[in-house]
Amino acid sequence: KIGADANTKTAPRSAVVTFASTDGSKSATVRVDQQARGEAFPSKWVFQASTLPLYGSSWTDDNVIPATSGAAGFISVVRGDANASAAFKRSVVTNRPAVSTMVEGDYWLYTFPVENLAAGSVVDFNATMAGEANSPKYFIVEYLDGGVWKSVEADLLTAPENPAVRYTYKCSGTATGSSYQHATVMQTMRFENAVTDGEVKIRCRAVGPYTCAGGTQNITATNAASSIPPYGFTGSYVQNFGTATPRDTKKVLCLGNSFSYYSNPAWMLKEIAWREGHALNIKAHFKGSQTLTQHLSLGFSTDVIEQGGYDFAFLQDQSQNPANYGRDATASILTGLTTLADKVRAASPSCKVILEETWTFSSASYG
């Protein structure tokens, strides 16, 4: 197999390779053409049956997941130095790309070929991540800037098992079925250095030896796949926001269900706000069909609430709940809202809580 580095130019390129027998009596010449790069941003990954031909075999055979729409970005997995000799086990299960035998130091790598990324550019990284019981629990989002891997220190959390383990997001250990909880990853980063005729690189690196189930990682373990969930979730979306300096920064909490993740309104909100001069640091948890009351019992929802410091919170109730909260006969709906709002304000006393009424109707009109 003949491989080539990503073409960072806007024009196609070609090369000629000659194969010759050791005695020189026979030879063959092969021309290799490589298409011009597409635009690096935005790059978007949605994993479903209709896009499977774009990534299925390239992932399992070649360790490449090209963007399914948008631009020229691609995802791969890379071993850390301690595990360099061990092979990954890559698969596609119900359209989701998965990798087993990932352990501490290994990482998901996002690569974006660029002709020029200006110094001071802000790149917005969004992803949905999942892990099985014996997969790595903690990951840190890092970006390669001037040859150095950096993280956004202000957004790092501390693992309760060991304060030396700092992370950006964690996986739940339940990737499928009714009990799943996925990690919603939203990280904005500013590149101090320009990238010219090269690649913008962002990675999600496993940190700490802990599994989602609370054990110690083992590279030969089963039930240990890390994966990127299929549609309705969007796997990833990465955009270049440009070099502007926003007028202000607000921290925003988003909790909701499928109405909050099918079309990625939180990711779009972040981009729209930036264009209007506002930076949003959004933390979120989304799970399908959940009511506000059910969010109170979801570990990932309570974790993100307890991070605190929010200026705004958007709470999106389950669409089949009547939405006349203040006067509806279905008292449990009002109770769920007020209890969740009180929990938000306990960690963020000055937070403005905003209720999203998915569909507005009374209980008399239910169904």
Regions found by a protein language model. Give the residues of each.
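Surface-exposed binding patches on compact interaction domains or structured appendages
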Residues: 1-3
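A short beta-strand micro-motif common to beta-rich folds, especially ectodomain repeats
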Residues: 11-23
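Extracellular carbohydrate-recognition regions
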Residues: 38-71
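Surface-exposed, low-complexity/disordered Ser/Thr/Gly/Pro/Asn-rich loops and linkers
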Residues: 69-119
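Extended extracellular/luminal ectodomain segments enriched in beta-structured repeat modules
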Residues: 105, 114-126, 136, 197
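Terminal, low-complexity interaction segments
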Residues: 149, 160-244
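Serine-esterase "nucleophile elbow" of acetyl-processing enzymes
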Residues: 245-284, 303-305
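Alpha-helical cap/lid subdomain in secreted, periplasmic
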Residues: 303-367
